[in-house]
Amino acid sequence: DKNIYEIPNGLDKKEAPVAEPTAVSLHAVLIGEESLKKPLSECRTLVQGGGAIGLLCGLILSKIKGNKNIVLSDPNKLRLNECAKYLDAKFVHPGDVEIKSNSFDIIFDTVGLEASRQQAIDVVKPGGSIIHIGLTQAAGPFNFRKMTLQEVTVIGTYCYTNKDFEQTLKILANKDIGALDWIEFRDLKNGGDAFKQI
């Protein structure tokens, strides 16, 4: 029973399923915030990945934590264009010149590829944080030397706590991250096509 929540007033039952990825994103942002030596609002932030978790991390960072210096990267132009409709950030391809070595205070890796991890450790500033959320690849090379010598904090995050989920329901019901009009509804018979597009 402790994991069953009533949908609050202000949150449409069609929007309620977004609570799960929002709670994952909130949990990651809160853990990232705890790891920093300055407020999130003062950080230059990279969000790797423009899927649901990446977009939601960006919305929480921007609309709740006051972070106005966000770069979101994704190789899929359709995702970038969609995210740009709802999030105030700079949107780039992962290979863009905007993503330079030692230039971000905190990175949220919502992808979890070897390539995204390598980029994260390259672009994080000394003393910065990498919050690893994505689970695409289990292993691969990583610059532990930079992590050690430059005192970079690397934290893995998984799911959320009950407190995170309760807070998420309030955030969604109060529209604290904006309207959820970015949610798309498709017939189940078109599910395969939807996955191909992402």
Feature roles, as predicted:
Residues 11-94:
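Mid-domain Rossmann-like dinucleotide-binding core that forms the NAD(H)/NADP(H) cofactor-binding site
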Residues 41-44, 104, 127:
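Phosphate-coordination loops involved in phosphoryl transfer and adenosine-cofactor binding
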Residues 1-5:
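Glycine-rich phosphate/adenylate-binding loop and adjacent beta-alpha elements
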Residues 47, 109, 132:
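Redox-cofactor binding/interface segments in oxidoreductases and associated redox assembly factors
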Residues 118, 162, 166-198:
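C-terminal hydrophobic helical "lid"/dimerization subdomain
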Residues 115-174:
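Glycine-rich phosphate-binding loop and adjacent beta-alpha segment
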Residues 98-107:
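A short acidic, Gly/Pro-enriched loop at the edge of an enzyme's catalytic core
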Residues 89-96, 185-190:
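Short acidic-hydrophobic, aromatic-tinged amphipathic segments that line or gate anion-handling sites
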